Amino acid sequence: MSTKFANDSNTNARPEKPFIARMIHAFAVPIILGWLAVCVVVTVFVPSLEAVGQERSVSLSPKDAPSFEAMGRIGMVFKEGDSDSFAMVIIEGNQPLGDAAHKYYDGLVAQLRADKKHVQSVQDLWGDPLTAAGVQSNDGKAAYVQLSLAGNQGTPLANESVEAVRSIVESTPAPPGIKAYVTGPSALAADMHHSGDRSMARITMVTVAVIFIMLLLVYRSIITVVLLLITVGVELTAARGVVAVLGHSGAIGLTTFAVSLLTSLAIAAGTDYGIFIIGRYQEARQAGEDKEAAYYTMYRGTAHVILGSGLTIAGATFCLSFARMPYFQTLGIPCAVGMLVAVAVALTLGPAVLHVGSRFGLFDPKRLLKVRGWRRVGTVVVRWPLPVLVATCAIALVGLLALPGYKTSYNDRDYLPDFIPANQGYAAADRHFSQARMKPEILMIESDHDMRNPADFLVLDKLAKGIFRVPGISRVQAITRPEGTTMDHTSIPFQISMQNAGQLQTIKYQRDRANDMLKQADEMATTIAVLTRMHSLMAEMASTTHRMVGDTEEMKEITEELRDHVADFDDFWRPIRSYFYWEKHCYGIPICWSFRSIFDALDGIDKLSEQIGVLLGDLREMDRLMPQMVAQIPPQIEAMENMRTMILTMHSTMTGIFDQMLEMSDNATAMGKAFDAAKNDDSFYLPPEVFKNKDFQRAMKSFLSSDGHAARFIILHRGDPQSPEGIKSIDAIRTAAEESLKGTPLEDAKIYLAGTAAVFHDISEGAQWDLLIAAISSLCLIFIIMLIITRAFIAAAVIVGTVALSLGASFGLSVLLWQHILAIHLHWLVLAMSVIVLLAVGSDYNLLLVSRFKQEIGAGLKTGIIRSMGGTGKVVTNAGLVFAVTMASMAVSDLRVIGQVGTTIGLGLLFDTLIVRSFMTPSIAALLGRWFWWPLRVRSRPARTPTVPSETQPAGRPLAMSSDRLG
C-alpha cells in the first residue's frame, strides 16, 4: 500500500471543466447583457453615489465617546441645542471694528436667530459690552459669534444648516472694509464632504488614464485594453449602483471617505482581476492550448484566487463595521458590499467577455510572453533562500525603522485646500486670534444645588485655578474670571483696601470734628474764666447779702417802732378819723379827703412792717444759700479745667490715630492695587451683594445654568489643541478638576469635558482600539480564507505573516515619504484605513503565487516555485503596479487625507508586489520545503512516472517549460 501525496500527478486525469465555468461559457452573451442592464438600471433609476452620499451622509461623531456625551449634556443644560454641530461667524475689518461693524453684526445675529430651522442658539457675546472683550481680538479688528446648528456634524441637516448660515452672511451687505466668514467644525466637515465629492471625478479620470496607459504598454492592444476597462467600468458602475441603492433606501449611511475608497478599490481590484484573467488565458494560449482549453485553464487558475481576494477585501473592510468610531464603521458595509458586487461581476462578466472576445482573437497575446527573467529570479530564490530572505528583511527594516518616529496629526485644516471657505475663515481668525481661541475646551460641573453663593464661588474659582495651572493651558474663562483672568477688585486685600478707601473719605470730616475740639477747649477756657470771675462776684454778693440781712433787721425794728407810734396816734385820733370815713361827701371836701388819705397811709405802715418781716426771712434764706452757692463754683471750675485737659488730650490722641489711619490706609490701598494689578487670585472672594448686581447677573447667564446647578469653564490651550501635546493635556485637565473639587461641597458634582482636544482624545483612544479590533478580526478572517483555499496551515500563516510584515514596512515607508521628506504629518485616519485595506489587498498576490505553487507542485517543490514565479511574475507585477498606481491616483484629491491613504496603500502594494511576493514569500517556501504545506503531505521531488502528453499540452510545448526542474 503506497502513501498518497498531495503533489502526486494523475496521468489519467482529464482537464476539469467546472460547472460555473461551463455555465458562463454557455451563457456568456446573456451574462454580458444582464450586467449591462443592471448598470443601466442603477444609472437611470438611482441617483449617483455622490448624490446619495450627500443625501444619506452620516455623522462621523462617536456618540458614546465621553466628549460627545458631555457636549450634548452641556447643550441641554444651557438650552443651546442638542446637536454637536457648531459654526462660527468671523467678522474682520481693515481697521478696528466700530459702530458700523456692530450694526452689521447686530443685523446678522437677528437674522441668524430668526432661522429657527437651522440655528438652535447664538452666543451673542460681542453684542453685550460686559462680555464683548471675550470674543474680540486684541487689535480690535476681529470678533466672532458662535452658533449651535441643527443636525449632527456631517449629516445632511448639518450641511444644510451650514449653507443656510452662509446664505445669510452672503445676502447681508457688509460695510466697506468689513468681511464675514463662516467657519468652524461643521463648516469644515461640510466643505470636506463637498471637496471629496468634487475630487471624485478627477480621481476617476486620472486613474482611468493611468490604467489605460499602463495596460496599453502591457498588452500592446487598444481593443484588449478598452474591453478590460469596459469590464472594469461595469464592475465599478454595478458596485457603486448597488451601494447607492442601499444608501438611497436608507439601509446604510455614507461618507465621502467611503465613496472615495469604494471607487478606488473597485477600479483597482477590478483591473487586477481582469489582469489575472487575461494573463492566465494568454499564458495558456502561449503554452499551446486552444481557446476553449485556455478558457477553462484560466478559470481553474484564477476563479478561486479572485473569489478569495474579493472575499478577503470584502471581509477585511467589513471588519471595520465592528469598530466603534463612525469614521471606520461607515466604511465597512459600503466597501464590503461594493467589493462583493465587483467580485461577482469579475467572476461572471470577466470570463464571459473573455469567451466572447476570444472567438475573435481579441485577447490572444500580441507578442511572446517572456518568463525567463522571472524564472531566473525564482532560480536565485530557491538556490539561496536564506540570503534572499535576509536581504528582503533588511529592505523591510527601512520602513520598520521609520515607524518609531511616526507622528500623527488631528488638524483637518492641514489636509484641506486653502481656498475652501472654512479654511479661509480659519485663516482670517488666525490673523487676529490664537489657534486655541477658535478651538476651546468646555468643562462643565453639575451639582445638586444652586451654586450662586459666595461659598460655592470660592470652589469654582479654586477649580478654575486648578485647571489654569495645568501645563499647556493659557487661559480659563469662568464666572469668576469672565475674561480669562481674575476679575478686578475681587481679592480680599483689595476689598479691605476699598473699606479703607471709605474710611479715607470720612477721615477729613473726622479730623475737622477733632479740630472742633480745640475750639471747644478754647470755649471751655473762656467759661472757666467766667466762672472764676463769677465766683469772686458771688462771694462779694454773699457778704453783701449778709450785710443786707443785718440792715433789714434794723429796718424791721424801726418799722415796728414806727408802727407802734402810728398806732398810738391812730388810737388818739380814731374818733375824728371815723368822721372822715363816715362823711359821705368826704371826697368832695378837700380837707376831709386829705386827712382820710393820711389815715389810709398810716394804715399801710402796718402792711409795710409785715412785708419787711417777710423780706427779712427771704434775705436770711439767701444769706444761708449764698455761701453754699459760692462753694459750688470752685468744683465746677475744676471740672471744667479737667474737661478741657481731657479734650486737649483726646484731640492729641485722635490726631495721632488719624495720622496712623492715613498711613495704614496708604499701605492697604497700595496692597489692594498691587493684588489687583498682579491679577493675584490667591484670596478670591465675592460678597453676597455682588450677586444682586444686574451686570453680574448678565454675566452669569453665560457661565451658569438658569437654575444655578451647573457651571461651565472655557479652557484655552497655549498651543494647537489638536497637537499630540494638546490631546495629552485632557487627562491632566480632568485630574486637576477632580483634585480641585476634592473635600469641597462640590466634591460629588459631575464633571463633563468637551471641546476640540477632548474630542480628538476620545477619537485617538477609540481609533487605537478600533484599529486593534479591525486588524485582529481581519487577520483572523484572512487566515481562515487563506487556509480554506490553500488547505495548508503553514502556507496560510506565511501569507498572513508576510502581509503583516509588509504592512509595517509599507506604513513606515509612507511615514518616511510624508513626514520626513515632504514634512507633512500623516492624518490620524491614514493608519487605520490603510492598514485594513493593505491587510486585504496585500494577501491577493501572495494567494495567487501560493495557489500557483500548489498547481505546479507536481514538478517538485523547487521546480514548482520556479515555474510559479515564471508564470505569475509578470501578471502579478502588472496587477500590483496597476493597483498601486490606482490607489496612488487618490493623491490628486483635494482632500490630502485621501491622497495620503492612497499613497500609503500604493507604497504597500509596491512593496508587497516587488519585495514580498517576488522574494520573501518564495524564499520562505523554499526554506520550509515540504513543511510549508503542512498538514498536507507532499513530495520534495516529483514521483517518477512515464511521460504521457496530455490533451491540453501538445508535444510542441517549449522545452523550457520542463528543463527548469531543480528538485
Swiss-Prot record:
Gene3D superfamilies: Multidrug efflux transporter AcrB transmembrane domain (1.20.1640.10)
SUPFAM superfamilies in the record: Multidrug efflux transporter AcrB transmembrane domain
Lipid bilayer topology: Multi-pass membrane protein
Highest taxon in the source lineage: Bacteria
Keyword Cell membrane: yes
Stimuli inducing this protein: Transcriptionally regulated by MmpR5. Repressed by iron and IdeR.
Subunit composition and interactions: Interacts with MmpS4.
Protein name in UniProt: Siderophore exporter MmpL4
Taxon lineage: Bacteria, Bacillati, Actinomycetota, Actinomycetes, Mycobacteriales
Gene: mmpL4
